[in-house]
């Protein structure tokens, strides 16, 4: 017994000794125990202590002794040769095995070292030389594992095989968006949601899908406009493959310009903006387009109630691919569908997106993008009147009057870009872009009157045209440097030449009498006010992982020069993530943004004729400071929960002054605009089910957005609600796969009403012409519109074919026919007096519950129950 106890004491003492020894003492102990000698260079770092060594043989002891150190050992007879581990860089692209399309945000791991592919599917991983096991995963794809022996820097492309059985909505580990990202407020909406979520008339829509996310409000029902965290629709930077677009809507806002078949990935940033983004104050919508299938010709054709779409992609030779997508509106069905919507019969829109990519090898790729979209509508009216007239001698004659009017409105975007990707040695990735983004709208009104007085003909015709044009030319270079798996440094710079022509117009008048021209005058003609501007930007951000803590500090610098004045802007950014446990994560962030362009409404509602203008020597850039924090939980398999709060300060916001609610020309607009401050704050909750046959989410947003004009020109200098200040918003999305042939999806949305300015009564003021009556408005945006809510459902019937599949989509928009306030009008509550058959008189008010003479709002609903059906054939 004593012998056993003595042995135990010696073993414990030995263990304690090992636990407290230094690395060199541990090496000396192994030399004594196993009769070996260590051979190494004097510069080899052998400092530090050994936690514990409990191996039963020399090999196991050496593994434990040098674990976690950049030291490699080799046993040669009685010698153990030590040398410093050399690091090598493994880089390449992750792609879809069936199409060759690069995958954005794929996770690449070797042990506890990981990376994520960037916007071009590129990854860079620095690992110790020798044998490694590489694991690559991506949502909706089978995981792939490779065993590699690395003795030098190496390029390894990885192709993943799609797996329809994998329905998880997240990838464990490293991500650019969601819980795994350092920044908060970055959300990626899956392609399955974009293509399967029920939408108006069955048209899958990128921007409307974003409206299902917390913190994102819509405009009127059916609109694809975005109001993010208390901001306006012009405060969202919409990027198509990194190129800004000024108008993202078709059909007066009912559809977005992005055809889902051409889209690879959509990411929304609403806070903690990475330093590489700038130019808007509320959100960044980064839309990445397909590169093209490298394995064969594939595509799809879709016929719906309103549009026809076609998409085709494939290889052009061994290293070149293309992607081509087109969409047109059914003009024949617009009258049937558009009449109850108040749309003109003669309406047409189209868009086309083309992309070609070429690989010169593992280090160089070139991409060419082109997009063009246009909307056009025209209304014509004609009226004939026949009546009898008498001349000064009381002689009768016949008069024929032919009155005609015409209205045309055209608008559209043109975007083109050329990009070059280059890899410098595996750790440094660059992307150089030359791009053009243009937008133009044109409005024409014409009135004509032809009069025939017994053969004597006269004509009077007037014509008014108005156009606005924007053109941006931009060279830009971005770099991504990965010195280690725990650090990614991004930096870059660009210059944009802006040209704004907001007010081109012409006004002409022509008169004829008896076949002779009496007057043919161009009353006014202007090629528009030429408003150029230069915008330069540069940025630096450093994403660092320090164990459970990740940081992304950055700085974005911008300089805008216009109207002889320079506006520099230093915009610090900081994001932090703390992984408290495997289930709980905390995040916080701060970002400053600046915006140098503004959209001014041409009328009282948003139209494609709205005017974009740059900052001037009188109107400074709009700025915002946003603080946000959030908590995230993933402890329940297949579920994730998150809660975020934010506060945003706004400076130099623009509001039309009282009684000046419309644009009045580029030379006058500064006089109708007041600048002020704003604030927006709120909380957002999101519950996601991310795995299984049933997936989806529930989100709730509680928010407030206000404005104030300190000079008192609006609302006497008091705070007033922003026009899209909606207190509550609830979104529910669900997707259920019954089997591989049938799937269902449904959305239910509720939102508090937005704000409008409503006169409350008539008042009288003394003017130059005496007592004058006018409407009295107590405050700006003083009335809350009724809330909106609706349920949309959709079902897909799929059938595999020898090549591709057939899909029938049947949906219903606004299932229970909610009478939502699609637009509002106001009226005066009048008393009407009428006589009954018995001779007595009675009177009544339009609205008995409202005092006589009071102004009240009337709700008008456009979208009732709308069924839809579409047919898609893929090949």
What are these regions (language model features)?
Residues 357-375, 406-565, 642, 689-690, ...:
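Face-selective signature of the C-terminal outer-membrane beta-barrel domain
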Residues 741, 750-771, 786-790, 797-875:
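C-terminal beta-signal and adjacent terminal beta-strands/loops
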